[in-house]
C-alpha cells in the first residue's frame, strides 16, 4: 500500500525538536556535499536520485533503496581502503625504484578519489532517503492517530445512547419558574411555578412515558397544545386530589 504524502498543517514534518535537529543536520550535510561537487559527480555517474523520485517512494520502496545504499557505501569504503593501501605501497616502490613514479597517479590516486566520491554520493542519497522515511512514518502516525478515534466512534452504539437520552428528564430553574426538559429533545419542556409540582409531574407522568410516547409527543405538529394539555390535566388532577383530601379531613373532624 502506497503511503501518500499528506500534509497536516498543525503537525507537518519535522514536528518535534529531535526531528528538526535531524532534518537540519541532514540538509546541511547534503548541501555541503553539493558545494564540493558531489551532486554533479553523482549525476554524471548515474548515482543521483531526483527528489521527485524519492518523494514517490512508499515506505517499502524507501527501505529497500536504503538497504541498497548501505551495501554500496560499504562496498565503496572497502575499495577506498584498498586504494589508500595501494598509494603508500606504490610510493615506497618508487623510492626503491621498483615502480615508475608516474604509476602512482595512474593506479592509486584515481581509485581513491573515485571511491571517495562514490561513497559520499551514496551517503548523500542515504540521508535523503532516511529523511523521506522519517516523513512517511510521521504521516503514518498522524493517520493512525486519526483512525483510532474514528474506529472508536464507529463502535459506539448510538441508537442505544439516543434511546437512553430520550428517557432522561433534566430540570433547571429559570427566574422564578421550574423547568423540566428532555435530554434528547431539548425543545420538549414543561414549566411549573412550584418545584414540588414539577417533581411529582416527573415521577407520576414523565417517568412512565415510553420512548415511542416521547417520539410521538416531540414530533407531533400540535406538540405545544399537547404539552399544555398534559400539564393542565396533571395540575387539575392534583388540585382535585388536594380538594378531596381537604374535604375528607373536614368530614372526619366534623364527625
From Swiss-Prot:
<feature type="glycosylation site" description="N-linked (GlcNAc...) asparagine; by host">
    <location>
        <position position="16"/>
    </location>
</feature>
<protein>
    <recommendedName>
        <fullName>Uncharacterized protein R342</fullName>
    </recommendedName>
</protein>
<feature type="glycosylation site" description="N-linked (GlcNAc...) asparagine; by host">
    <location>
        <position position="58"/>
    </location>
</feature>
<keyword id="KW-0472">Membrane</keyword>
<keyword id="KW-0325">Glycoprotein</keyword>
<keyword id="KW-1133">Transmembrane helix</keyword>
<feature type="transmembrane region" description="Helical">
    <location>
        <begin position="72"/>
        <end position="92"/>
    </location>
</feature>
<dbReference type="GO" id="GO:0016020">
    <property type="term" value="C:membrane"/>
</dbReference>
<keyword id="KW-0812">Transmembrane</keyword>
<feature type="transmembrane region" description="Helical">
    <location>
        <begin position="104"/>
        <end position="124"/>
    </location>
</feature>
